[in-house]
């Protein structure tokens, strides 16, 4: 381990690969709530967080598990379509809570164009949340709807049905033909929009 008068031990969360403090400081200086997006292999989570000297406060949050529980999502929760739907959900939740704008915080996730973290952003923006962005970073619409997944499933089924059933077993167990994923995406998206727009009309 390095040592000497000029050596500084990095903060613990930086050592653990959890926080980029330089980037965090820039986000805090904006003074806006942060749209915090995090992902794992099987799920995405989105939160609207504001800085507080005593500790960050979460104003609203959404998890891809809610897509399954509340809106009947049958697809995988770690893919691009589910990420977009999560963004739509957090965007509507934020608007309902009176939050009009935020700044994106993807933590240590690499800012890769078209990645699922930017699908979350796209969904939030489509819900009406004002987040500074460049449209070029969004995934293509066909990827947001899961058309690439449906096409791959179709090809795999024709070439190797056993492998198809292994890879898409989770879809099939829930009664979803992966070739119908784009249509299923449209149905779940419509349910999210209907829920929040009908609630807004009643208010």
UniProtKB/Swiss-Prot annotation:
The keyword Coiled coil does not apply. Pfam families: Ribosomal_L5e (PF17144). SUPFAM superfamilies: Translational machinery components. Disulfide bonds: none annotated. InterPro entries: Rbsml_uL18_euk (IPR005485). Keywords: Ribonucleoprotein, Ribosomal protein, RNA-binding, rRNA-binding. One of its GO terms (biological process) is ribosomal large subunit assembly. CDD domains: Ribosomal_L18_L5e (cd00432). Gene3D superfamilies: 3.30.420.100. GO terms for cellular component: cytosolic large ribosomal subunit. GO terms for molecular function: 5S rRNA binding; structural constituent of ribosome. It comes from the Archaea. This is one of the proteins that bind and probably mediate the attachment of the 5S RNA into the large ribosomal subunit, where it forms part of the central protuberance. Part of the 50S ribosomal subunit. Contacts the 5S and 23S rRNAs. Belongs to the universal ribosomal protein uL18 family. This is Large ribosomal subunit protein uL18. It comes from Pyrococcus abyssi (strain GE5 / Orsay). The lineage of its organism: Archaea, Methanobacteriati, Methanobacteriota, Thermococci, Thermococcales.
């Amino acid at each position: 381990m390095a040592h000497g008068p000029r050596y500084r031990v990095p903060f613990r969360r930086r050592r653990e690969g959890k926080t980029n403090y330089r980037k965090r400081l820039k986000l805090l200086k904006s003074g806006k709530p942060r749209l915090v997006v995090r992902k794992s292999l099987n799920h995405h989570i989105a939160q609207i967080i504001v800085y507080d000297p005593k500790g960050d406060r979460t104003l609203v949050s959404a998890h891809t598990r809610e897509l399954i529980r509340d809106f009947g999502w049958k697809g995988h929760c770690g893919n691009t379509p589910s990420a977009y739907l999560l963004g739509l959900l957090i965007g509507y939740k934020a608007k309902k809570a009176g939050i009009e704008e935020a700044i994106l915080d993807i933590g240590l996730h690499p800012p890769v164009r078209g990645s699922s973290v930017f699908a979350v952003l796209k969904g939030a923006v489509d819900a009406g949340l004002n987040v500074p962005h460049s449209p070029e970073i969004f995934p293509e619409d066909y990827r947001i709807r899961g058309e690439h997944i449906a096409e791959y499933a179709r090809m795999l089924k024709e070439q190797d049905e056993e492998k198809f059933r292994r890879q898409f077993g989770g879809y099939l167990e829930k009664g979803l033909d992966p070739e119908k994923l784009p249509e299923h995406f449209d149905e779940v998206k419509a349910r999210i929009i209907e829920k929040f727009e009908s609630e807004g009309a009643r208010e």
